Regions:
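Conserved beta-strand hairpin/beta-sheet module of binuclear metal-dependent hydrolase folds
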Residues: 58-108, 198-200, 205-210
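Zn-dependent metallo-beta-lactamase
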Residues: 19-88
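C-terminal regulatory/interaction regions
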Residues: 21-22, 279-322
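C-terminal motif of bacterial Sec signal peptides marking the signal peptidase cleavage site
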Residues: 15-17
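Active-site HxH/HxHxD metal-binding segment of metal-dependent hydrolases
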Residues: 100-103, 107-176
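Divalent-metal (often Zn2+) His-rich catalytic cores of metallo-beta-lactamase-fold enzymes
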Residues: 229-282, 286
Length: 322
């Protein structure tokens, strides 16, 4: 039987936080991630309820994914963060979408470790991953790609409590934290202009933030469509055992690997169909009425993202992207 990702028992974590001098080992997890889950980002179609969140899973020793629900209109889906616990502090990859949800994540991290949060990597500069950054404790080092600085400044104009990152990187940053090697990489423009990924080479875990949307309709508001495909192919070449999405569910390593390819093919479908309609001379509005994106029409966020994705491909074809 292949290794699966195991949910943390939140009850056990709460007991660990009660201050016992030598806490007992956590009990065995109550359940495992399904070997072949329903392939959807809709929590209700998976038989989950709001009470099942946040979900925390240990991907490798001391490496955790954190899934919380967020709403887009009437739809609910997950926003995923990752955190790495070391003897010298905790690194968090992506916050959540508001102060309360990020504060809850900080609280849950505190149930797992007494180590302080030392680093926050802004992997996506979108507000659903950064608008709660003011909830992180003082003294945190924020890391951002140079292409995302302007976006963070715009968010801070709306939410002054958000700290501006002091560490600005370009292509690569290597950290050693508590003996762990952590690679922060820019693999190219994708969902945004400054997507960063966090790679743990020894644990073979790769956090792909919003560049990897697991059964969520390709969201292209600020994307670079064909560059996005190329970026994800470079991510595949890393060959990580666990590929963690920024939205959608954290499933078994095998499912996540397969679904990364599905996500690439979803992008290619949007690009190909939009290009076909563009070559017919249709306006974006006319194209939106005629477009057929196949199975993607059933994916989460189709209603809000379909037309936007088509228009973004048109912009790329017209040479209008920055």
């Amino acid at each position: 039987m292949s290794r699966t990702l195991l949910p943390i028992s939140l009850l056990a974590l709460g007991l660990q936080a009660c201050g016992a001098p030598e806490p007992a080992p956590a009990p065995e997890p109550e359940s495992e991630v399904a070997e072949d889950p329903v392939r959807t980002a809709d929590p209700f179609k998976r038989g989950l309820t709001e009470a099942d969140f946040p979900r925390i899973q240990e991907l490798a020793p001391g490496v955790y994914s954190y899934e919380q629900l967020r709403a887009a209109g009437e739809e609910l889906f997950t926003t995923v963060s990752m955190f790495v616990v070391t003897d010298e502090g905790v690194l968090v990859a992506d916050g959540q979408g508001n102060f309360e949800e990020t504060a809850l994540m900080v609280e849950e991290i505190g149930k797992i470790t007494d180590q302080p949060i030392s680093h926050v990597v802004i992997c996506s500069d979108h507000g659903d991953h950064t608008a709660g950054n003011g909830a992180f404790p003082e003294g945190v080092e924020y890391i951002v790609h140079e292409n995302s600085v302007a976006a963070m400044e715009r968010i801070r104009e709306r939410i002054p409590e958000i700290p501006m990152p002091e560490t600005v990187m370009s292509d690569r940053m290597d950290l050693t934290l508590g003996g762990r090697a952590i690679e922060i990489l820019f693999l190219g423009r994708a969902h945004t202009g400054g997507d960063l990924v966090v790679h743990l080479p020894e644990e073979s875990v790769l956090f792909l933030t919003e560049a990897y949307l697991h059964r969520v309709y390709p969201a292209m508001r600020s994307a670079y469509p064909t560059e996005w495909v190329a970026m994800l192919r470079r991510a595949q070449e890393i060959g990580a055992r666990v590929n963690v999405p920024g939205h959608g569910f954290v499933d078994s390593p095998e499912v996540l690997r397969d679904e990364l390819q599905v996500a690439i093919e979803a992008l290619e479908t949007v690009i190909a169909e939009s290009t076909r309609l563009h070559e017919m001379g249709l306006t974006p509005e006319e194209a939106d009425e005629q477009a057929d994106f196949g199975d993607l029409e059933t994916w989460s966020l189709r209603e809000s993202q379909r037309g936007m994705a088509l228009r973004r491909v048109y912009m790329e074809l017209n040479g209008e992207l920055p």
